C-alpha cells in the first residue's frame, strides 16, 4: 500500500496534540505536588487548555489564513513545541497555567487547517477517509501516547513527560516540512465575509450537531471511572484496561466513520448516532459484569469516534467558502461539547439519580444530535466538498 506522506505527517501532529491534551489527566497528583497546589487546582490546567482551544481555533486560523498552509501548520506545531518546553521548565503553578494555554492555541487551528489539507491531497471520493487518517493520530494517542507519557511522568517526573511531548512537536515540524507541498501565500481573508458564512443556518446547525455529538461522548467519558466502579464494581486496574479498550474503539470507529462518510456523510451520522444511543442505554445492564463492560466500552468507543470524520466533513461542506475557519471553529465546538457533556453528567450525579443514569443522559444528548441531523438532511441535501489546496 502506497504511503500518503502528507497524511502521515498530519497524523504525527495529531498524535502529539492528543498526547499533550490528555496525558495531564493521569498526572494530576504528580503535577499538583510538583507545583504545590491541590489536585482540583491542578485540574484547572485541563480546563484552561479547553478554553484555549475554543479561543485559539478561530483566532489562529484567521491570523494564519493568508499564509501558505504548510508554513501555517509548521508554525502551529512550533507553538505546540514551545508551550510544552515552557510547561516542562515552569517554576510555579501560574507559569504552568500560562504555558498550557499557549500550548492549546495551536490545537483547533491545526485540526481545522489540517482537515482542509488532508482533503486536498486525495481524490474527492476519499476526502472523509483522509480526514479520518489525520484524526487517527488523535485516537492512537489515547492508546500509546497518553499511557507512555503517564508512565514517564510517574517514573522520571512530570517535567520529562512534557519534554518528551515537545520532542513529538519537533518530529511533526520536520515531517510537515518535507511532506507537504510548499504552496503560495493566500490573499488576506475578508473576516466579515468568512464570519458571515459561519452565521448561515445550515452552518450553525452543523456546528450545533458537533456540540451535541461531543456532548454525548463526554457526558459518559468524563465520569467513566466512577460509572464503571458503580455498575461493574471495577478495580482501578480494570478501569485502566477499559480505558485502553475505549482507545481501541476510538481507532476502529474513526476508521469506519471515515470510510462510510466517503459514501454518505448524513447516513454515517444517522447510523452511528443511533448506535451510540442504543449502546449507552444498554450500558447500565451490559456492564454489570466484566465481559459485558469490555464489549460495551469497545462498541461505545467505536460509535463515539465514528461520528467525528462525518461531523468535520459536514461543516466543511456547508461552509465551503471558509473551509479553514469553519473546520477550526468545529474543533472549538467539540471542546464546547466536552464542557457541556461534563456538566450534563455532573447534573445527573448532583441530582442523586445515580451513576447508572449518566450513560442514559448521554443517550438523550445523542438523540438530540440525531434529531438535528434528520431535520438538517431534509433541508440540505448532501453535496460534494471540494477542498482547494
UniProtKB/Swiss-Prot annotation:
Main location: membrane
Segments in the Periplasmic topological domain: 28-43, 92-100, 152-159, 225-236, 288-290, 352-356
Keywords: Cell inner membrane, Cell membrane, Membrane, Transmembrane, Transmembrane helix, Transport
Record InterPro entries: MFS, MFS_dom, MFS_Efflux_Transporters, MFS_trans_sf
PROSITE patterns: MFS
Protein's membrane topology: Multi-pass membrane protein
GO cellular component, one term: plasma membrane
Transmembrane annotation, as ranges: 7-27, 44-64, 71-91, 101-121, 131-151, 160-180, 204-224, 237-257, 267-287, 291-311, 331-351, 357-377
Topological domain spans for side Cytoplasmic: 1-6, 65-70, 122-130, 181-203, 258-266, 312-330, 378-389
Transport as UniProt keyword: yes
A Pfam family: MFS_1
CDD domains assigned: MFS_NepI_like
Cell compartments where the protein resides: Cell inner membrane
GO molecular function, one term: transmembrane transporter activity
GO biological-process terms attached to the record: transmembrane transport
Homology family: Belongs to the major facilitator superfamily.
Protein name (Swiss-Prot/TrEMBL): Inner membrane transport protein YdhP
Amino acid at each position: 500500500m502506497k504511503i500518503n506522506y502528507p497524511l502521515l505527517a498530519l497524523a504525527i501532529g495529531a498524535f502529539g496534540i492528543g498526547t499533550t491534551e490528555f496525558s495531564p489527566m493521569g498526572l494530576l497528583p504528580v503535577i499538583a505536588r510538583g507545583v504545590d497546589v491541590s489536585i482540583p487546582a491542578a485540574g484547572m490546567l485541563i480546563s484552561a487548555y479547553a478554553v484555549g482551544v475554543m479561543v485559539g481555533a478561530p483566532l489562529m486560523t484567521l491570523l494564519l489564513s493568508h499564509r501558505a498552509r504548510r508554513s501555517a501548520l509548521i508554525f502551529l506545531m512550533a507553538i505546540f513545541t514551545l508551550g510544552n518546553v515552557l510547561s516542562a521548565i515552569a517554576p510555579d503553578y501560574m507559569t504552568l497555567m500560562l504555558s498550557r494555554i499557549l500550548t492549546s492555541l495551536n490545537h483547533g487551528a491545526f485540526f481545522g487547517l489540517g482537515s482542509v489539507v488532508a482533503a486536498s491531497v486525495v481524490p474527492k471520493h476519499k476526502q472523509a477517509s483522509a480526514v479520518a487518517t489525520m484524526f487517527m493520530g488523535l485516537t492512537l494517542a489515547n492508546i500509546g501516547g497518553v499511557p507512555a507519557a503517564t508512565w514517564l511522568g510517574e517514573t522520571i517526573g512530570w517535567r520529562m513527560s512534557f519534554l518528551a511531548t515537545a520532542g513529538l512537536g519537533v518530529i511533526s515540524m520536520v515531517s510537515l516540512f518535507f511532506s507537504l507541498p510548499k504552496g503560495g501565500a493566500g490573499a488576506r481573508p475578508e473576516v466579515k465575509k468568512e464570519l458571515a458564512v459561519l452565521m448561515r443556518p445550515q452552518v450553525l446547525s452543523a456546528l450545533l450537531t458537533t456540540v451535541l455529538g461531543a456532548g454525548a461522548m463526554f457526558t459518559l467519558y468524563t465520569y467513566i471511572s466512577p460509572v464503571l466502579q458503580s455498575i461493574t464494581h471495577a478495580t482501578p486496574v480494570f478501569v485502566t484496561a477499559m480505558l485502553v479498550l475505549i482507545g481501541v474503539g476510538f481507532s476502529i470507529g474513526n476508521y469506519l466513520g471515515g470510510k462510510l462518510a466517503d459514501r454518505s456523510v448524513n447516513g454515517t451520522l444517522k447510523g452511528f448516532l443511533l448506535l451510540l444511543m442504543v449502546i449507552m442505554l444498554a450500558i447500565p445492564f451490559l456492564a454489570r459484569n466484566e465481559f459485558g463492560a469490555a464489549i460495551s466500552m469497545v462498541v461505545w468507543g467505536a460509535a463515539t469516534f465514528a461520528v467525528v470524520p462525518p461531523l468535520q466533513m459536514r461543516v466543511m461542506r456547508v461552509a465551503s467558502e471558509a473551509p479553514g475557519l469553519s473546520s477550526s471553529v468545529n474543533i472549538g465546538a467539540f471542546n464546547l461539547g466536552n464542557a457541556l457533556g461534563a456538566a450534563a453528567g455532573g447534573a445527573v450525579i448532583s441530582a442523586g439519580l445515580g451513576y447508572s443514569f449518566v450513560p442514559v443522559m448521554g443517550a438523550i444528548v445523542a438523540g438530540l444530535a440525531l434529531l438535528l441531523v434528520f431535520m438538517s438532511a431534509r433541508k440540505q441535501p448532501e453535496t460534494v466538498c471540494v477542498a482547494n489546496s
